[in-house]
């Protein structure tokens, strides 16, 4: 007999009591509040052995700044990494960043923070806590962030430049960010939200008195507004005792300032806020319908979760309708979606939002089409079949969350605690949630959902925000005209939504099965099955995610078998297929048929391979293999869908070059590859050379013969259940071995271009709304394609990144960050590439560039900094332990060994330990000795 907990019995027996029933917090969390008001959440999680995450969350943000402090909430976040009482960085005690990196916690990846309008959160993630001293030190950092920042004059002045460069990075090439800053005074007129974005005023950042920052810290960083969150392989009771001892001594201010949550007023007439920017490529519209938030104290009942459930169904169904419209031959908009949540930047007001990209030649038509669907839903609701699909999908998500409840990484539970502390969202178990969804699916009716639609979607309390290109050829309708577009569309008469009844199976008549002709043990613990049509299947059984199976089916070929003249078609080959649906079903029908399934497959074609990749739940493995069969053997043509996609793309590309970043990227690729025809960007004129017939032919030829294809399955696979499915859906793929393949003729490999052999610097200027210099430096050199070479490159880019952080960011305050990345390939010849990227003030470019080159030369001449190299190796060893319990890692390792002949797994830890400074130095030396360096810089005029 199935055993139910009391709350489950309540759900099953008394639906009318559920709505008012108080929720019990997930008992796996140890929570409490100290006398000084500090809240804590502690949870044991053994998924990542020896690893824990440490967070401090603050219910404070930029909305609490005084006018003279604009930007200081965010500035303070930066200062938390620049000196605290116990981590001074003065030679007597280490600074926070060096200490964390000495134990394998990487700045940026594991050690970070963010500031928003109403909250500030700091994290030390993926901390190896095998030694108690490390755990104690992580808690001590949280303690210092809470109460003991030094905020010295010297460090404040050093950070001003870094903040200014972050402002430059966030605004450069991001027109919507700039326009949002400009529309907020209209949207929030008369409130603190008019000017509240965290980056603040650069005039204040550059010049504020030190006292203003210290005043903000003293006033708002206090225990009654803070929470400590610790999740991972720890003993909760012991951590709780440490928190009480360490944080309990922090005093609570006697006359603490009131933490005000500023309200947002309703509006009778629509507020219209428009803005234009010369770097904005398309017209974006956001129509908000404001409504009151649920008070935090009312989020503790089952009724609150039921309301959220109904809202999620409404959004799912409405977005499905909007997606259908995009399949038309001439789609009425570029994109459209529906959302619900906080109104813009304010947590004190919620809103339903319609977000859509307008066709510039028919702005009114875009408004009409999007609002028509929201009005249709508001007036007539949704059909029973739509509701059933949405409920099925919601149940599948809950079932997966329950099945994988013990497979969750630490951040999953951290986010639960954060949402509870910052937004009062309830923390419930996956078992409770699953039973709740099942009960909602049984008891929530279409009438209830359709009543809720009328509350969510309204013609009152509306705000329209429009971002548009600032181009002479584009005429933006006046604000009153845009308002009239909305009101007229909301006043029209509409017919109810209707759809044909779904019938049939994905594959009405399954193919007669093939056979398994051989089985053997394979690499990395795989089982290898040879199929009768020549496909070789590798199965890696894992229990890392209880309800996940991933597949990959690939073969040699790709676009390199087609001439340069076909290059305009390449970007559309796979999208043309997926936009058409598959088998007998168009894309919209296929989406509906898969609503109750957790399965999907996507084709892709690269330079040298064609692949089908997908994921599914354990129960839906059959569906995933059916889709694999259909995309290989029975792709679908849909001229209307293809023409619609091309038409939408043509409209989207109208102002493609408006963004300077696009022009820069085009120039970058042209310089690197010498304007090679296979490396050309897609522009409006390119679309005229795209042929659907040719796109279809390329796809069919790439997936014509499975005889030399390889399949890899990774996950919770039942091999006995898998065998008949492989015979039915994989062994029957067209193949020269079973005489079902249609072989293309005259195939010849056309090599993909390499980066040019050159040593040169290119600089050009372009008008930008945010002055900046954007620099990319590429080094290419021949390097053996081995695991050791890959590791040496990895460590080189990490120690170089550290050197740049110290010299360019911290010492000079010259950039928000220098990015270093690498590639190692064996396509035409084994080649390595190192890429260095940064953005800065044009006035600082000449000063910073020599430093960038000098740091690399220093490593080539003298070797890497020993401390930096030790930190990089510790980080790699730590992440290796995290990676090997992930299905994606095994998919990557096995695929690359089968495809490229390189084993990234075996002996990796020893390889890391044995890597020497001389190995890294030699890699840097080889890189410089190649004399193949291309620098491309774009400066503002």
Each language-model region and where it sits:
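Bacterial Sec-dependent N-terminal signal peptides
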Residues: 1-22
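Proteolytic maturation boundary segments
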Residues: 19-42, 235-323, 327-329, 388-392, ...
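M16 family metallopeptidases and their MPP-like homologs
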Residues: 41-43, 48-65, 71-73, 91-144, ...
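Active-site His/Glu-centered metal-binding helix of metallohydrolases
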Residues: 72-80, 314, 573
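Metal-associated gating/positioning segment near the N- to mid-region
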Residues: 79-91
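Peptidyl-prolyl cis-trans isomerase
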Residues: 148-156, 444-448, 452, 636-642, ...
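Hydrophobic, small-residue-rich alpha-helical packing segments that form membrane-like cores
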Residues: 155, 160-225, 229-231, 236-244, ...
């Amino acid at each position: 007999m199935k055993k139910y907990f009391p709350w489950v019995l309540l759900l099953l027996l008394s639906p009318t009591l559920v709505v008012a029933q108080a929720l019990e917090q997930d008992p796996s969390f140890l929570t409490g509040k100290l006398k000084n008001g500090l809240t804590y959440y502690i949870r044991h999680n053994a998924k990542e052995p020896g690893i824990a995450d440490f967070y401090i969350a603050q219910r404070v943000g930029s909305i609490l700044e005084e006018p003279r402090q604009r930007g200081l909430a965010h500035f303070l976040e930066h200062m938390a990494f620049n000196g605290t009482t116990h981590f001074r960085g003065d030679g007597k005690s280490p600074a926070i960043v060096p200490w964390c990196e000495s134990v394998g916690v990487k700045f940026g990846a594991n050690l970070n923070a963010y500031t928003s309008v109403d909250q500030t959160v700091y994290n030390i993630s993926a901390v190896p806590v095998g030694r108690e001293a490390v755990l104690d030190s992580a808690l001590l950092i949280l303690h210092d962030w809470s109460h003991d920042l030094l905020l010295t004059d010297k460090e404040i002045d050093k950070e001003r430049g870094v903040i200014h460069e972050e402002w430059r990075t966030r605004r450069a090439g991001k027109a919507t960010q700039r326009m949002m800053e400009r529309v907020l005074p209209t949207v929030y007129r008369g409130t603190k939200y008019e000017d509240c974005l965290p980056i603040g005023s650069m005039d204040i950042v550059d010049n504020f008195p030190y006292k203003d920052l210290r005043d903000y810290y003293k006033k708002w960083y206090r225990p009654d507004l803070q929470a400590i969150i610790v999740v991972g392989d720890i003993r909760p009771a012991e951590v709780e005792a440490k928190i009480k001892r360490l944080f309990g001594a922090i005093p609570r201010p006697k006359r603490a300032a009131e933490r005000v949550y500023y309200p947002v007023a309703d509006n009778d007439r629509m507020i219209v806020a428009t803005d234009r920017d010369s770097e904005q490529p398309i017209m974006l519209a956001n129509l908000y319908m404001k409504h009151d938030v649920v008070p935090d104290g009312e989020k503790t009942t089952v009724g609150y979760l039921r309301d959220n459930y109904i809202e999620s169904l409404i959004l799912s169904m409405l977005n499905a309708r909007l997606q259908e419209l995009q399949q038309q031959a001439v789609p009425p908009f570029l994109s459209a979606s529906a959302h619900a949540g906080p109104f813009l930047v304010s947590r004190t007001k919620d809103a339903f939002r319609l977000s859509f990209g307008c066709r510039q030649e028919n702005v009114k038509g875009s408004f009409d089409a999007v609002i028509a669907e929201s009005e249709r839903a508001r007036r007539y609701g949704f059909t029973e079949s739509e509701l059933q699909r949405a409920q099925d999908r919601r149940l599948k998500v809950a079932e997966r969350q329950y099945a994988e409840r013990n497979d969750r990484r630490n951040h999953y539970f951290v986010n639960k605690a954060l949402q509870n502390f910052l937004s009062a969202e309830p923390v419930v178990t996956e078992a409770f949630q699953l039973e709740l969804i099942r009960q909602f699916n049984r008891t929530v009716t279409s009438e209830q959902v359709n009543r809720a639609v009328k509350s969510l979607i309204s013609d009152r309390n509306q705000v329209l925000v429009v971002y548009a290109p600032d181009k002479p050829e584009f005429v933006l309708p006046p604000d009153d005209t845009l308002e009239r577009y909305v009101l007229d569309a909301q006043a029209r008469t509409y017919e109810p939504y209707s759809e044909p009844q779904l019938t049939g199976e994905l594959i009405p008549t399954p193919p007669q099965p093939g056979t398994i002709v051989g089985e053997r043990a394979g690499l990395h613990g795989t089982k290898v099955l040879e199929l009768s049509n020549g496909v070789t299947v590798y199965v890696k059984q894992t229990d890392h995610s209880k309800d996940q199976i991933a597949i990959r089916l690939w073969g040699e070929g790709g676009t390199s078998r087609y001439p340069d003249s076909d290059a305009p078609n390449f970007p559309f080959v796979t999208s043309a297929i997926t936009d058409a649906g598959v088998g007998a079903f168009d894309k919209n029908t296929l989406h509906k048929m898969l609503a109750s399934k957790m399965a999907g497959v996507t084709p892709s074609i690269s330079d040298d391979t064609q692949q089908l990749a997908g994921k599914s739940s354990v129960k839906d493995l059959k569906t995933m293999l059916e889709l694999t069969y259909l995309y290989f053997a029975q792709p679908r043509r849909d001229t209307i869908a293809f023409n619609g996609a091309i038409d939408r793309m043509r409209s989207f590309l109208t102002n493609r070059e408006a963004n300077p970043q696009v022009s820069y990227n085009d120039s970058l690729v042209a310089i690197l590859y010498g304007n090679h025809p296979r490396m050309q960007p897609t522009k409006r004129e390119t679309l005229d050379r795209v042929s659907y017939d040719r796109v279809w032919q390329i796809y069919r030829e790439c997936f014509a013969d499975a005889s030399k294809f390889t399949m890899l399955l990774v996950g919770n696979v039942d091999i006995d259940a898998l065998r008949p499915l492989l015979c039915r859906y994989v062994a029957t793929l067209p193949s020269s071995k079973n005489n079902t393949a249609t072989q293309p003729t005259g195939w010849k490999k056309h090599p993909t271009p390499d980066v040019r052999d050159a040593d040169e610097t290119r600089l050009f200027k372009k008008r930008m709304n945010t002055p900046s210099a954007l620099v990319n430096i590429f080094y290419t050199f021949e390097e053996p394609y081995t695991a050791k070479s890959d590791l040496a490159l990895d460590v080189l880019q990490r120690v170089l990144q550290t050197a740049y952080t110290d010299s360019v960011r911290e010492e000079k305050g010259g950039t928000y960050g220098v990015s270093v990345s690498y590639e190692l390939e064996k396509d035409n010849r084994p080649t390595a590439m190192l890429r260095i990227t940064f953005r800065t003030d044009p006035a600082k470019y000449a000063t910073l560039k020599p430093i960038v080159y000098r740091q690399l030369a220093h490593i080539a001449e003298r070797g890497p900094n020993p401390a930096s190299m030790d930190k990089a190796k510790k980080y790699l060893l730590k992440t290796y332990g995290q990676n090997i319990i992930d299905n994606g890692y095994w998919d990557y390792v096995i695929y690359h060994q089968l495809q490229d002949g390189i084993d990234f797994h075996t002996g990796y830890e020893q390889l890391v330990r044995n890597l020497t400074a001389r190995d890294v130095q030699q890699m840097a030396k080889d890189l410089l000795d190649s004399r193949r360096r291309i620098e491309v810089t774009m400066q503002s005029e």
